[in-house]
């Protein structure tokens, strides 16, 4: 299987009906712009759903819908974690995957609260969880290579991960889902995400690396050094976004990237969580720039490089809560705001409907 074996055909959203969509938003019973970011979000959702339905006129009559919102949590282990770059050992990845399956993690609580269906995907943790229902096996290996010593994986593995992710998204699309959100679990994956960020954005490592879920200063110095070694080791091989994933990524980051591309290909809305998920989005946009039209960025995390990545992607996140957990928690918490955008667009009266003089 070659590097180009899996490709995605992603249409840009149509903006030809923007004036009519914006007019519908502006004529609601409120001053123009008074609902702030919810208005720009409604415009984005209307663009995506108008593109999906291939409507050519009357977008003001379109009813926006969020159908079967689904949270996909991708899990994988990282070779670099053996060097102690995180507050927890790699075994915790497996333990947390079990916790997800048993419904006891933060992401389970939030998904139940807001109405997300949750699926957990084993992309390649060190030891698979057996005898527990609710974990989807999409294993690409038993943890990646240690990126400061060797490539994380082969290029062929990236394509295999993309193909698995496409099949996963296709299953949900066929079931009627039109919004997917992505979370992750993988001890050491902030190191991989920071390395990806540095490689793609051409930044110094110190501008990309943070404390993850709470490492001390000594561990942070080790993390910086190892990521710098990784970038130096693979410098000549970093020739494109897929090679960046192969050299520096994680199995869960690969499958998140592929799932974002596949969802956009199917004109589904994609809710991006925190630092790790945004690194996957960064790669996805390099592969297919049109994917950006479909991405909703849930929050700005407490990881110091996240703000830079969001700015690079010209993304304005919906929330800023100081989160640094991952799992898709920020994406889950953003769903009520996304639904609020849909609801005001569909249900608010216009000035003429309400018999109110328009506010200019």
Curated annotation (Swiss-Prot):
Q: Does the keyword Transferase apply?
A: yes
Example GO biological process: cobalamin biosynthetic process
Pathway the protein takes part in: Nucleoside biosynthesis; alpha-ribazole biosynthesis; alpha-ribazole from 5,6-dimethylbenzimidazole: step 1/2
Against Pfam families, the record matches this protein to: DBI_PRT (PF02277)
GO MF annotations in UniProt: nicotinate-nucleotide-dimethylbenzimidazole phosphoribosyltransferase activity
The enzyme's first-digit EC class, named in words, is transferase
Which purpose does this protein serve, as stated in its record? Catalyzes the synthesis of alpha-ribazole-5'-phosphate from nicotinate mononucleotide (NAMN) and 5,6-dimethylbenzimidazole (DMB).
The family this protein is said to belong to: Belongs to the CobT family.
Record-linked PANTHER family: NICOTINATE-NUCLEOTIDE--DIMETHYLBENZIMIDAZOLE PHOSPHORIBOSYLTRANSFERASE (PTHR43463:SF1)
Q: What is this protein called?
A: Nicotinate-nucleotide--dimethylbenzimidazole phosphoribosyltransferase
